[in-house]
Design a protein with these regions (language model features):
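N-terminal "arm"/small-domain region of PLP-dependent enzymes with the aminotransferase-like
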Residues: 2-62, 70
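Short, well-ordered beta-strand elements within core beta-sheets of diverse protein domains
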Residues: 253-263, 311-318, 374-378
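PLP-dependent enzyme catalytic core of the Aspartate aminotransferase-like
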Residues: 149, 175-176, 264, 345-396
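Conserved N-terminal alpha-helix of the aminotransferase class I/II PLP-enzyme fold
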Residues: 40-89, 114-121
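Conserved PLP-enzyme active-site core in the AAT-like
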Residues: 2-5, 10-22, 80-284, 289, ...
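A common structural junction motif
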Residues: 241-242, 330-339, 392-396
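C-terminal core of ALDH-fold dehydrogenases
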Residues: 12-31, 322-362
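Conserved small-domain helix->loop->beta segment predominantly found in fold-type I
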Residues: 273-342, 358-364
């Protein structure tokens, strides 16, 4: 391979960010330290003044975390990335530095429950926050204001899988004001399936707990974008506001997990398509929601901006919430648990679990029905996942 040739996604998941260790270690070294020694007082001064690159204190940067951040930046097509100790750490660290009292935030109505709760909490600081249906571009246009500082979106959205036209929302936001930033949560898609930065988004956030790590054993997050914005996220959002710093050991685990991201995502998606087909055929399933279905709202948008349609599926069963509980209480292979993107298939009830922070009215506005079930399709044999779901559905 020539030096200037761009490497494939699969190759970068393995090699991007790799450190040439003093001892020749193939694996990423874990720098388990809180602080770093300066050669002299002058060097310490230069590093604090940002006149010299180097490490100071692990809350501000660590070589293990740095390697991980470089890997994600390459995969997302970003100049830089910041790792955090949770997805909410990434989201809050990416919002706090850029807002002040009197600003307006426009967010999609269907969001991860804790993101929704956070955006409601900051209203007490005189931040005007509005939640709208961003799948409707006319709604976006109508609600943008002169003081709109941030447009915040998830696509596919949690849990309804709503697809928002990233490129068109960015155009509207930038036309509204050069000071309007667009932040996109790319957790459900991962950089393998979607790259919001290439569509004009300013900052992309992730819960790395999910597909990026992929093994259900770490809580972590990422923010990525330009070097200028990531400096603000790290040195203001993370350092001064949230203190949400990822441990070096967890950074090592995610670095290792990300090496198989493409392989895992291919299998997740392949399994999901089989599960979707089976759910559509079951007599006790009322409706299946999946961006890959041709009758799914904004299917064409998903087709345009995503490489494939992801590994999350939601469905409603006949009989409402009690029937849904019957299904969840009777699965044997699937695990009744929140989170997603694990090797295991996870099933949960958004209205009473992940989105319990939503009021009844907000649930209705977000399109989260009382009987909606969310399924994160894992890496087990697809036929065995289907068999388990069918036997539980048969009990309704």
């Amino acid at each position: 391979m020539t030096e200037n040739k761009k490497r494939s996604f699969a190759t970068e998941t393995i090699h991007a960010g790799a450190i040439k260790d003093t001892y020749g270690s193939l694996g990423l070294p874990i720098y388990q330290t809180s602080t770093f020694i300066f050669e002299n007082a002058e060097q310490g001064g230069r590093r604090f003044a940002l006149e010299e690159e180097g490490f100071i204190y692990s809350r501000l940067g660590n070589p293990t975390n740095d390697a991980l951040e470089k890997k994600l930046a390459v995969l997302e097509g970003a100049e830089a990335a910041v790792s955090t100790s949770s997805g909410m750490g990434a989201i809050t660290s990416s919002i706090w530095p850029f807002i002040k009292a009197g600003d307006h935030i426009l967010a999609c109505a269907t969001l991860y429950g804790c993101t929704f709760a956070f955006l409601n909490e900051i209203k007490k600081f005189n931040i005007d926050v509005e939640f709208i249906d961003m799948t409707d571009l006319e709604e976006v246009k109508a609600h943008l204001k002169e003081n709109t500082r941030i447009v915040y979106l998830e696509t596919p959205a949690n849990p309804t899988l709503d697809i928002i036209d990233i490129e068109e929302v960015v155009k509207l936001a930038k036309k509204n004001s050069k000071d309007t930033m667009v932040i996109a949560d790319n957790t459900f898609a991962t950089p393998y399936l979607q790259n919001p930065l290439k569509l004009g988004v300013d900052i992309v956030v992730h819960s790395a707990t999910k597909y990026l790590n992929g093994h259900g054993d770490v809580i972590a997050g990422f923010s990525c974008g330009s070097k200028e914005l990531m400096t603000q996220v790290r040195l203001v959002g993370q350092k001064d506001f949230t203190g949400s710093v990822l441990s070096a050991h967890d950074a090592f685990l995610i670095f290792r997990g990300m090496k198989t991201l493409e392989v895992r995502m291919k299998q997740h998606v392949a399994n999901t398509k089989k599960v979707v087909e089976a759910l559509q055929k079951h007599k006790n399933v009322e409706k299946v929601y999946y961006p890959g279905l041709e009758d799914f709202k904004n299917h064409e948008v998903a087709k345009k901006q995503m490489k494939d349609y992801g590994a999350m599926v939601t469905f409603e069963v006949k009989g409402g919430i009690e029937a849904g509980r019957c299904v969840m209480n009777n699965v044997k292979l699937c695990s009744l648990a929140v989170s997603l993107g694990d090797a295991e298939t996870l099933i949960e009830h958004p209205a009473t679990m992940t989105h319990s922070t939503y009021t009844e009215e907000a649930l209705k506005e977000a399109g989260i029905a009382p009987g909606l079930i969310r399924l994160s399709v894992g890496l087990e044999d697809a036929d065995e996942i289907i068999e388990d779901l069918n036997q539980a559905l048969d009990l309704i």
